[in-house]
């Protein structure tokens, strides 16, 4: 595959779709593979879209084919160029490059209009003037057949004239539409004379004010696939019944053969998250989150800001696979992918999130120590650690009294400082409320990189940061946004927001992190994996987001 088509190698597992493609190529039904990723630009992409992106681009890569990026932009009321830009950015960030220029369904509006006229001329479409309420009533239910519209038997000439009036803006919104003439008694509601065109007086981000009639998704999607010569149109299971309409439209218009075929796979249902764009938008507009890229959001941009890497999301999509069975994927499976990625690749650093001051009384002069940036990757080099008389440790790493299971600093006992010396807690200083403000210690200068010479055992190791050579930092500790496993089932999502989904703390990091780069993941030793916030963080305002805990099951 050429670099101009795809830039990322994706390992795909065999699945029912690859089996179908293998059969199509072997039989000569197709001699190439052409897929597409067709989002509607009415919101930011989420983790479910990542699965579709990896599937469509991954299959194109595996079969040395092509994959288009096409915006299904048929509803100008909900769409915006902001979403177009974000979608392009997300696809590229995940590591993919589409074939040629991005496509738009609106590129085909003239052709779609022509095919609509063809259906009218064949007696397969008519202009209906039922109100939306009447249309719902006439449509019937799953157990009751629909009934024909009183406008269904208009002549071809009358329908052509009325459709032209629709195009010319002579009907108000909701007063007329073009419907396919199929079967109002069909057991599949989607086939009960579905709407093909409706009137909308709205400015379109691509076509401006050229049109006041816009085609419906089901009419547009299949024709766009055929125009682009897509061989395998991959959709999620909720479009399974729509395949009948997909095939009906293509079989009844004069478009080049062979026709594309639609195949459905299960959508991604991730435990504890929402993928409804409407509900995600509600979180944004209600101020529950600070935007589509809030690190608690399941959007690709939110996961990116939180510190997820493209490789981790691609690996997650590979692991969950492609099936026809709906299931719920545990959130831990997603976390495992980023945890493994960062464990292997993230440089190490130390951060004290809940600081308490320590004075090492027998330190005479500051000393520069060396620490590896990664214990298993010597090629990543070393960093300088200033060891000073005053340091900070985490308040959870000290107790005045403790049992043998507590392997940290205890009054009168020793512990090792990470990448440094053994220290001993001698006494403490408290404020008027009894809170410890300072721990006074001594250190053994002969223990750098080795055990005490007299053979005494020091079991615990704690992290630390110099109190005089550091950088102040804010730490944003993210937990699940919802306190229920299936927030999508809730009527009022605001009622199930986890009040502890964001905990903000202030502390200190190594002075080296003054040069932290946005989206660079770090393992803050004994704390978790963090990255510099890409929206608000900077060298002068260090804000680190918790990407994932060091171990599964941790919550702040």
Curated annotation (Swiss-Prot):
EC number of the protein: 6.1.1.18
Main localization of the protein described in the UniProt heading: cytoplasm
Molecular-function annotations in GO: ATP binding; glutamine-tRNA ligase activity
Cystine pairings recorded for this chain: none
Motif interval(s): 'HIGH' region: 39-49
Annotated L-glutamine binding sites: 72, 217
GO biological process, alphabetically ordered: glutaminyl-tRNA aminoacylation; glutamyl-tRNA aminoacylation
Residue interval(s) of motif 'KMSKS' region: 274-278
Keywords: Aminoacyl-tRNA synthetase, ATP-binding, Cytoplasm, Ligase, Nucleotide-binding, Protein biosynthesis
UniProt-listed InterPro entries: aa-tRNA-synth_I_CS, Gln-tRNA-synth, Gln/Glu-tRNA_Ligase, Gln_tRNA_ligase_bac, Glu/Gln-tRNA-synth, Glu/Gln-tRNA-synth_Ib_cat-dom, Glu/Gln-tRNA-synth_Ib_codon-bd, Glu_tRNA_lig_a-bdl
Any GO CC annotation of this UniProt entry: cytosol
PROSITE patterns on file: AA_TRNA_LIGASE_I (PS00178)
Catalytic activity of the protein: tRNA(Gln) + L-glutamine + ATP = L-glutaminyl-tRNA(Gln) + AMP + diphosphate
Domain of life per record: Bacteria
Ligand binding (ATP): 40-42, 46-52, 236, 267-268
Pfam families named among the record's database cross-references: tRNA-synt_1c (PF00749), tRNA-synt_1c_C (PF03950), tRNA-synt_1c_C2 (PF20974)
Subcellular location(s) per record: Cytoplasm
NCBIfam families in UniProt: glnS (TIGR00440), PRK14703.1 (NF011291)
Subunit structure: Monomer.
Similarity comment: family membership: Belongs to the class-I aminoacyl-tRNA synthetase family.
Protein name: Glutamine--tRNA ligase
Species of origin: Haemophilus ducreyi (strain 35000HP / ATCC 700724)
